[in-house]
Amino acid sequence: MQTYDNPNIKYDWWAGNARFANLSGLFIGAHVAQAALTTLWAGAFTWFEISRYKPEIPMGEQGLILLPHLATLGFGVGVSGQVVNTYPYFVIGALHLISSAVLGAGALFHTFKGPRNLKNTTGSARKFHFEWNDPKQLGLILGHHLLFLGMAALLLVGKAMFWGGLYDATTQVVRVVNHPTLNPFVIYGYQTHFASVNNLEDLVGGHIYVGLILIGGGIWHIVKEPLPWAKKLLIFSGEAILSYSLGGIALAGFVAAYFCAVNTLAYPVEFYGAPLELKFGVTPYFADTVKLADGGYSARAWLANAHFFLAFFFLQGHLWHALRAIGVDFRQIEKSLNAISSAE
């Protein structure tokens, strides 16, 4: 992290992972713990939403954010988007809770029993030790991240083609996608209007391409260190890597917000409510186009706006850490502004 030439800087508890940015073993433990918390929330909140779900009220009007995703994946859904069985949701919630326990145990192991720094260990674990100024090792770790993202994209393809299918909002039934679109011109054509996709064949075909590209990129980064031009262009430091990550999350959040707001194939009206419209107040926001009872908001409104505002703050984090990475000292800016004020 940026220390401004102070090698003895001490981070308090609120600094998060910065406290052990140079301890690769504890750094892994922190990430595993964060994964455990994420899966714990997903499992527990799925069960909570099951307890609140009312079959007689449209799902999109109940303020649910997880069950609509599971229904879109074809779990427990019958004709016309009717939820006929909530037991699959219970099982999925349980699997997430069990996974969180396993991940939590892994986090505790890495925190209390594992080596604090993988540099001091032996065997295959040592190859995951990294230094923030080592482009080759950072590329290796990036490659493994891309492999997992690619496999996740292909899991959706597997669900669509082999494991029960997806809910098709155009026909209002769960169906298997037998012939996904593989024409690269069709898939690439969505670059300028990705949110207009209106058939499962194109949606699944896009995931095939994305999954394969991610896996290909992962293999590339594992076996090949960054090219000379990348080493010259990019800054390799903890602060810079954090800024790149936050920027990527911000971009994904903005894309997800818009996609959720307007697309009714990946986000069916039956589960999320009607499409939204963009409005402007103190800030831009997405508003329901259908008035709900008791002044409530649709699941689509909750998700789109949450993604938008979270993405906005991730973008601020990206800019903050990017500026710090290139050497901007915000303390000096404050001193300069105070000096100007005093002079006046």
UniProtKB/Swiss-Prot annotation:
It comes from the Bacteria. Chlorophyll a. Keywords: Chlorophyll, Chromophore, Membrane, Photosynthesis, Photosystem I, Stress response, Thylakoid, Transmembrane, Transmembrane helix. Its cofactor is chlorophyll a; all-trans-beta-carotene. The keyword Glycosyltransferase does not apply. GO terms for cellular component: photosystem I; plasma membrane-derived thylakoid membrane. Functions as an antenna for photosystem I (PSI) under iron-limiting conditions, when phycobilisomes disappear. In the (PSI)3(Isi3)18 complex most of the harvested energy is probably used by PSI; in other PSI-containing supercomplexes a large part of the energy will probably not be used for light harvesting, but rather is dissipated to protect the organism from light damage. Belongs to the PsbB/PsbC family. IsiA/Pcb subfamily. This is Iron stress-induced chlorophyll-binding protein. It comes from Nostoc sp. (strain PCC 7120 / SAG 25.82 / UTEX 2576).
